Design a protein with these regions (language model features):
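Conserved donor-nucleotide/metal-binding helix-loop-beta segment in metal-dependent transferases, i.e.
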Residues: 125-149
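Short beta-strand/loop segment that forms part of the nucleotide-sugar
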Residues: 42-51
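Short, glycine-/small-residue-rich phosphate/pyrophosphate-handling segment
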Residues: 156-181
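N-terminal nucleotide-binding beta1-loop-alpha1 segment
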Residues: 1-13
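A short, N-terminal amphipathic alpha-helix
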Residues: 23-41
């Protein structure tokens, strides 16, 4: 489940002239990388947003995961690409409400499967990293992975039959751990740098670029640079 604000309000801390375009591009790369994990692990990707233009663009561009997977066609060897679908954020009451809504929709659509919530700004995410993290999650209960700073959350997993119970926001990693989620951060550590590198500021964006961003983000950066020139 990937939450995305309306593009006009997304990434308000990212002081970049192409902020809205970058928010869309990063979400596109994130969705595509998730879709390329392999359907034996990721059955479907669900975007929760009230931005119809973003919804249409991301679902259209993420259909062919092979175009956007940065470490090769992972999905082809693991059951193929997962579908990328979008639903409106009907609660429209913030991030955690959107994630709870998305989790309910995902559970109805894909019964018997667990649910994972992930940041939609993981411009440098590799499918293999997400695959490793999801496979590291325990078969029961919940699991959490901290962001690069160690205080936020980039991935929250709930096994089949468990509620997601998202607590995103300030110090969300500690809140998720205190609420019973198993911490995956120590075990995965530096092996999943793209998964842990969310992008909120220009400093974060520079760090993601060092890791290597996806094609949509790369194109958005090139467009912004050309417009600035």
């Amino acid at each position: 489940v990937l939450p995305l604000k309306r593009l006009g309000a997304a990434k308000s801390r990212l002081e970049h002239p192409g902020r809205a375009l970058l928010a869309l591009a990063m979400a596109t790369d994130t969705a595509a990388a998730a879709a390329a994990v392999g359907r034996d692990v990721v059955t479907g990707v669900l975007l929760v947003t009230n931005d119809p233009a973003a919804s249409a663009a991301i679902t259209a561009q993420a259909v062919d995961g092979g175009e956007v997977a940065k470490d090769g066609p992972a999905g082809q060897g693991h059951g193929g690409w997962a579908p990328v679908l979008a639903v409106p954020d009907l609660p429209d009451r913030g991030l955690n409400a959107a994630l709870r809504h998305g989790a309910r929709v995902a559970t109805r659509r894909w019964p018997g499967h667990g649910v994972a919530a992930m940041s939609a700004d993981l411009a440098a995410l590799r499918p293999a990293e997400l695959r490793a993290a999801l496979l590291a999650a325990p078969p029961t209960g919940r699991a959490v992975l901290a962001d690069a700073a160690g205080t936020g959350t980039v991935l929250l997993c709930a096994a089949p039959g468990s509620e997601l119970l998202p607590r995103f926001g300030e110090d969300s990693h500690a809140l998720h751990v205190r609420s019973g989620a198993v911490d995956l951060t120590g075990g995965l550590a530096a092996s999943v740098p793209g998964l842990r590198r969310d992008v909120d500021t220009v400093v974060d964006l520079a760090a993601a670029r060092l890791l290597g961003v996806g094609p949509a983000t790369s194109a958005a950066l090139a467009t912004a640079a050309a417009n600035a020139g």
